[in-house]
Amino acid sequence: MNKEQFLEKIKGGIIVSCQALPGEPLYSENGGVMPLMAKAAEQAGAVAIRANSVRDIKEIQKAVSLPIIGIIKKDYLPQKPFITATMKEIDELVATSCEVIALDCTLRERHDGLTINQFIKKIKEKYPTQILMADCSNFKECENAYSAGVDFVGTTLSGYTEESKKQDGPDFELLEKLVEAKIPVIAEGRIHSPEQAQYVQKIGVDGMVIGGAITRPLEIASRFVQAVESVEKL
């Protein structure tokens, strides 16, 4: 699958992020949970899956026939980038044959000492046909990553870095700016409702990832609990 085929596949659809980290209720040392999430997403009509870790990706590949955006989350403290942050993670993801690899493309200091542009160049040299998605937090990062050679950008990290604006919902302003600049973009981050997803779609994005609103029951339940508790009794 090449970039054009992937973008055509996800056009007008929903990519569901199926992830659980250690310490979260749906995380299991033995695995087996995320492929069930992915199977439910596929039955609902999702067009692709975003997944974290080699184990989960392999399990999901056996459960569904959807393309996968693969990542590996690993801390390299004190540096902040942790989404597919070094060539080691790239190598491991390539070995899974996942269709797309997403990586932190912020301009923050990296563990490997490379600039993000140097890292992208090395990946493209080593794996010239691998589709790459840039997880970014602002327009400057997206513009830089796209010019450096990634296939499309994602607003994944908007609101989660010091270089971006914190907000409760999707970063509509950033999405609009990227579409206007004709930079291929997958919307991701805090799309909590079908209405927000509709608005994102109308902006003209190439695709969208929804995670917490679908596959994180703790987050979903908490939102309902907070809403009910905030209502004054009649």
Curated annotation (Swiss-Prot):
Gene3D superfamilies per record: Aldolase class I
InterPro entries: Aldolase_TIM, NanE, RibuloseP-bd_barrel
Known pathway: Amino-sugar metabolism; N-acetylneuraminate degradation; D-fructose 6-phosphate from N-acetylneuraminate: step 3/5
Keyword Isomerase in record: yes
EC number: 5.1.3.9
Record's keyword terms, sorted: Carbohydrate metabolism, Isomerase
The UniProt record lists the keyword Isomerase: yes
Listed GO CC annotations: cytosol
CDD domains, per database record: NanE
Signal sequence bounds: none
Function: Converts N-acetylmannosamine-6-phosphate (ManNAc-6-P) to N-acetylglucosamine-6-phosphate (GlcNAc-6-P).
HAMAP family assigned to the protein according to its UniProt record, in alphabetical order: ManNAc6P_epimer
PANTHER family: N-ACETYLMANNOSAMINE-6-PHOSPHATE 2-EPIMERASE-RELATED
Similarity comment: Belongs to the NanE family.
Protein name listed in UniProt: Putative N-acetylmannosamine-6-phosphate 2-epimerase
Organism of derivation: Lactococcus lactis subsp. cremoris (strain MG1363)
